[in-house]
Amino acid sequence: MSFAMLRSAPPPGRYLYPEVSPLSEDEDRGSESSGSDEKPCRVHAARCGLQGARRRAGGRRAAGSGPGPGGRPGREPRQRHTANARERDRTNSVNTAFTALRTLIPTEPADRKLSKIETLRLASSYISHLGNVLLVGEACGDGQPCHSGPAFFHSGRAGSPLPPPPPPPPLARDGGENTQPKQICTFCLSNQRKLSKDRDRKTAIRS
């Protein structure tokens, strides 16, 4: 009876794993090589996708920050535009003031071009000349009030009376005139030339 129950046992491979067949060495090596080749491709594709997303995000950021319809202009261009406009207004006001000042200064010739430095120097000299004219008055017959006394300095307040005219220059000890160099005033020289022309004209008319 014991002999009747014994049966031939199937091979262990077919009994436990009937659908699994062992692989050969060539197939095993081929599967390993294909797996190793697929891994770098997947990594490269992931990197490309990340870089593309970064480029798209950067492009949207740049488009939003520009002064287009979808973005707002930056603060720096607006401040620069305001500063440039303020500087242009200041330059125009200064040029207008210098142009008005040039019209008040007599020059020879009348249409003489003056720089800003020359305009300021001539304006200062003309103010000093007019001050000497007020101080000396008609006492100076040669038309050169600036040569008859010291330069004029307006030290009093507005509306205060003018000081008395200065005395004539003293004589030197050797009996000659004072050896101090005379101040040259272009406006006095211009007046002197005008006086000489008037004398010549009157002399020509009389003769």
UniProtKB/Swiss-Prot annotation:
Pfam families per record: HLH
One Gene Ontology MF term: RNA polymerase II cis-regulatory region sequence-specific DNA binding
Positions of region (Disordered): 1-91, 151-183
Biased composition annotated in UniProt, kind: Basic and acidic residues: 73-91
Domain bHLH: 78-130
Tissue: Expressed in mesenchymal precursors of cartilage and in connective tissue. Highly expressed in tendons in the limb, tongue and diaphragm and in cartilage of the bronchi.
Gene Ontology terms: cellular component: nucleus; transcription regulator complex
GO biological process terms, semicolon-separated: BMP signaling pathway; cartilage development; cell differentiation; cellular response to BMP stimulus; cellular response to cAMP; cellular response to follicle-stimulating hormone stimulus; cellular response to mechanical stimulus; cellular response to transforming growth factor beta stimulus
Biased composition (Pro residues): 161-171
Swiss-Prot/TrEMBL keywords: Activator, Developmental protein, DNA-binding, Nucleus, Transcription, Transcription regulation
Subcellular location: Nucleus
Protein task: Plays an early essential role in mesoderm formation, as well as a later role in formation of somite-derived chondrogenic lineages.
Subunit relationships: Efficient DNA binding requires dimerization with another bHLH protein. Dimerizes and binds the E-box consensus sequence with E12.
UniProt name for this protein: Basic helix-loop-helix transcription factor scleraxis
Organism of this sequence: Mus musculus
Gene behind the chain: Scx
